Structure formats: structure tokens, C-alpha cells
UniProtKB/Swiss-Prot annotation:
GO biological process, one term: muscle contraction
Residues with PTM Phosphoserine: 62, 88, 207, 216, 272, 284
Keyword terms of this UniProt record: Acetylation, Actin-binding, Chromosomal rearrangement, Coiled coil, Cytoplasm, Cytoskeleton, Disease variant, Muscle protein, Nemaline myopathy, Phosphoprotein, Proto-oncogene
Coiled coil (residue ranges): 1-285
Result of changing residue 9 to R: In CMYO4A; decrease in the sensitivity of contraction to activating calcium
Annotated localization: Cytoplasm, Cytoskeleton
Annotated domain remarks: The molecule is in a coiled coil structure that is formed by 2 polypeptide chains. The sequence exhibits a prominent seven-residues periodicity.
Sequence ranges of Basic and acidic residues compositional bias: 16-41
Source species, domain of life: Eukaryota
Organism lineage: Eukaryota, Metazoa, Chordata, Craniata, Vertebrata
Name recorded for this polypeptide: Tropomyosin alpha-3 chain
Name of the coding gene: TPM3
Amino acid sequence: MMEAIKKKMQMLKLDKENALDRAEQAEAEQKQAEERSKQLEDELAAMQKKLKGTEDELDKYSEALKDAQEKLELAEKKAADAEAEVASLNRRIQLVEEELDRAQERLATALQKLEEAEKAADESERGMKVIENRALKDEEKMELQEIQLKEAKHIAEEADRKYEEVARKLVIIEGDLERTEERAELAESKCSELEEELKNVTNNLKSLEAQAEKYSQKEDKYEEEIKILTDKLKEAETRAEFAERSVAKLEKTIDDLEDELYAQKLKYKAISEELDHALNDMTSI
């Protein structure tokens, strides 16, 4: 009887030790599972943070591309406005040149009339000399000569009046011509300034076109980076899904281990109670 009890006690003790070992092992596995679960949760949080940074960077690249497109459109509008202004100034220059041609024609006409007046004055002067010579030679024709002299003076006065009128008109024409030339010079100066401005605008436009090409290359680069980031995003999402499944699996494993630990504790409690009963029985014997 004692031998059977001792053997049973040894078996109970061995079962107790095995139960303690399994309980300790279950607790160790539970701790490892919890640590692995926390590690996966940290990795998932890091991936989500990295994903948020990638989305912010993508928004920044999109905004930079939008600003570049707006600047290019503004440069094209300025170039178009400059070309329209140059065309308008070319038309104004053409009108000024036509007005200058008309002024030169009026000046040529005035000079011709002045030349005719000078010829008439010369002829009058020669007539006066002829009359004076005839007066010296023939006193009898004095009255006729005086009449001719008066006529000559009248012609001379008329010629002088015409000359003064022509001279006055010439001064006016010269003033008009001078003002026209000043306007033409001003127009030429303005045209030169506008040509220089157009040249600068053209250079700026070329620079903007180069920038646009550069922005286009950057856009291609950004698109490539976006594609890479999209692939990384998909990969991160896949890893996140896998991590979530792993966490769920580990949580289930932890639950199973906790259930097993609880069962082992119950079994240990039952063995302890059975061992206590056996010891009590031995004490009673």
C-alpha cells in the first residue's frame, strides 16, 4: 500500500513538475509573442508614417508643377502683348513716315515757288536797269519810263510780298518739318527701345521655355518618383496587411497560449489538491 502511494506521489510530483515546466514555457512563449506583436505594431506605425510623408511630398511636387505652368502661361501672355504693341508701333511709324513724305513734298513745292519768286525779282531788277538806261538815253520817254518804273516797282513789291509770304510759309513748313523730324526721331527712339524690350522679352521667353523644358524634365522625374513611391506604397500596404494578419495570428496564438496556461494552472491546481489529499491520507495512516 505504501509502495503504491509513494509511486503515485512520485507520479503526481513528476506531473506537477511537468505542468510547471509547460506553464513556464507557455509564459515564455506568451512573452515572446507579445514582444513580436509589439514589434510588428511599431513597424506598422513606421510604415504608416512613411506613407504619410510620401503623400505630403507628392502634394508638394504637384504644387510646384502647377506654379511652373502658371508662370509659363504668364510669360506667353506677356510675349503676345509685346508683339501686339510692336505691331501697333510699326503702324504708327509708317503713318509718321507718310506724314514726313508729305511734308517734304510741301517743302519742295515751297522751294520751287521761292525760286520762281527770285527769278521774277531778278527779271524786275533787270527791267529796272533797262528802264534806267533808256531814261538816260532818251529823256523824251521819261514819262513812259516812270510808268514802267512804277510797274516794275509794283512787280518788285509784289515779288517781295510773294517772297515774304513764301519765306513765311517756308518757316512754317520748316517748323512743321522740324517737329515731324523730332516726332520721327522720337518714334525711332521708341521703336529702338521697343525692339530692345522685345529682344529682352524674347530672351526671357527663351529662358522661360528652357525653364519649361526643365520643369517638363522634372515633371517626368516626379512622375517616375511618383510611380516608384506608388509601388513602394503598394508594397507597404501589402506589408501592412501581412503585418496585420501576423498580428491577428499572434493575438490568436497568445489567446491560445493563455487558454493553455489557464488549463495548465487548473491542472496544476487539481494535481496539487490530489497531492494534498494523498499527503493527508498518508498522515492519517
